[in-house]
């Protein structure tokens, strides 16, 4: 009798994706982040669902409903902080996952890579709208500043902003629609993630060497299920430590003040995971230029396959490219730091230099380094 796991239409899909999937035998811990992102997404949907049961998307009651969740709902505080810090863990895993893709040349799977970029944009949009929901000072002013960026679009900008706001300022209509979108988008993300996996399984996984691994594959279960469980336990450990010991470490104190349109906070800034893009936005004195740089800072990932000039796929055997990659990581950390600083003398210049370096590394230095490495191999 044939195993039901291999014959049943539903079980067959699960089997071919997570059990009998042929996987390269040499993939490192950097390949754990896909499953960790799946865990983060499930956690966010579940905690978000329970929060939505008690949250009210009305400007007069939104802030107090979040307070009510933390004070009066059974274990509401832990659900709220798991959701808030779960988002931070989500982005840590996302950036590591994208970094892995850049380092090991996974962008040569163009369909998988492009859907990954769409996923990144969707998750960023979801997180931004979620940050608006508690209706604190930073929620309100963050929403005002970021949505206002669309007014830089020529001709239709101003109308577009008012259309998104549902009025002449960020108000009740804005909060209600942001809640609706914040609720539905994670399910869109789930669907996109499924398509992302579908395309990945068409080609099979990449591996650290960048060489085809068809001759040396092992079943996903038990080898990588065990490996993924270890990664998941470490993720849960870090998240639990964060939630139970310093839940507000990554948040902004201004968000514990109810939204007040008449009082602007001294420093308007988004959550830490958007600070690098915010720093790039601020480094350009022109509004439209800043918005374009902001979008391109993420969209630049889409042209990575075109900028790949190396004869090797990954950076495992390419020391010059490795140095540039880690310079890029340091540059992004610098931009993240700058994004959280006030707009004054040393920070403005550092931000502008870091922004130029970011685009220089990706567009100019890495392709040149790859060509140099190709020539070194001939000697």
From Swiss-Prot:
Q: Which cysteines are joined by disulfide bonds?
A: none
What does the Swiss-Prot or TrEMBL cofactor note state?
Binds 2 heme b groups non-covalently.
Q: How does it sit in the membrane?
A: Multi-pass membrane protein
Specify the domain of life of the species encoding this protein. Answer: Eukaryota
Q: Which UniProt keywords apply?
A: Electron transport, Heme, Iron, Membrane, Metal-binding, Mitochondrion, Mitochondrion inner membrane, Respiratory chain, Transmembrane, Transmembrane helix, Transport, Ubiquinone
Q: Which positions in this protein are listed as binding heme b b566? A: 97, 196
Q: Which InterPro entries match?
A: Cyt_b/b6_C (IPR005798), Cyt_b/b6_C_sf (IPR036150), Cyt_b/b6_N (IPR005797), Cytb/b6-like_sf (IPR027387), Cytochrome_b (IPR030689), Cytochrome_b_C_euk/bac (IPR048260), Cytochrome_b_N_euk/bac (IPR048259), Di-haem_cyt_TM (IPR016174)
Please tell me what else the database record remarks about this protein: Heme 1 (or BL or b562) is low-potential and absorbs at about 562 nm, and heme 2 (or BH or b566) is high-potential and absorbs at about 566 nm.
Q: Fill in the subunit field for this protein.
A: The cytochrome bc1 complex contains 11 subunits: 3 respiratory subunits (MT-CYB, CYC1 and UQCRFS1), 2 core proteins (UQCRC1 and UQCRC2) and 6 low-molecular weight proteins (UQCRH/QCR6, UQCRB/QCR7, UQCRQ/QCR8, UQCR10/QCR9, UQCR11/QCR10 and a cleavage product of UQCRFS1). This cytochrome bc1 complex then forms a dimer.
- The name on file for this protein is Cytochrome b
Query: Which gene produces this protein?
Result: MT-CYB
């Amino acid at each position: 009798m044939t195993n039901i796991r291999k014959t049943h239409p539903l079980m067959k899909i699960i089997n071919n994706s997570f059990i009998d999937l042929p996987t390269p035998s040499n993939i490192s811990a950097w390949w754990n982040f896909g499953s960790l992102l799946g865990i983060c997404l499930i956690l966010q949907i579940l905690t978000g669902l329970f929060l939505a049961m008690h949250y009210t998307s009305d400007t007069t009651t939104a802030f107090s409903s979040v307070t009510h969740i933390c004070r009066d709902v059974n274990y509401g505080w832990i659900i709220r902080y798991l959701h808030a810090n779960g988002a931070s863990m989500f982005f840590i895993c996302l950036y590591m996952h994208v970094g892995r893709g850049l380092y090991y040349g996974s962008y040569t799977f163009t369909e998988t890579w492009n859907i990954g970029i769409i996923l990144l944009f969707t998750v960023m949009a979801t997180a931004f709208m979620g940050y608006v929901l508690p209706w604190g000072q930073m929620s309100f002013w963050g929403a005002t500043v970021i949505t206002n960026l669309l007014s830089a679009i020529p001709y239709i900008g101003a109308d577009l902003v008012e259309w998104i706001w549902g009025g002449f300022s960020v108000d009740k209509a804005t909060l209600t629609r942001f809640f609706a979108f914040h609720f539905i988008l994670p399910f869109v993300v789930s669907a996109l993630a499924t398509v992302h996996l579908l395309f990945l399984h068409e080609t099979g996984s990449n591996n650290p060497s960048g060489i085809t691994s068809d001759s040396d594959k092992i079943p996903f279960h038990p080898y990588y299920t065990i490996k993924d469980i270890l990664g998941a336990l470490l993720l849960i450990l870090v998240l639990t430590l964060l939630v139970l010991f310093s839940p507000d470490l990554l948040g902004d104190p201004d968000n514990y003040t109810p939204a007040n349109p008449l009082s602007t906070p001294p420093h308007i800034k988004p959550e830490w995971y958007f600070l690098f893009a915010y720093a790039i936005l601020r480094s350009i004195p022109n509004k439209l230029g800043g918005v374009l740089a902001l979008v391109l800072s993420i969209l630049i990932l889409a042209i990575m396959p075109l900028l790949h000039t190396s004869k090797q796929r990954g950076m495992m055997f390419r020391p010059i490219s490795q140095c540039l990659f880690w310079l890029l990581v340091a540059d992004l950390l610098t931009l993240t730091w700058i994004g959280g600083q006030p707009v004054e003398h040393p920070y403005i210049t550092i931000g502008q230099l870091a922004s130029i370096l970011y685009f220089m590394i990706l567009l100019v230095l890495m392709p040149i380094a790859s060509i140099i490495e190709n020539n070194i191999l001939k000697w």
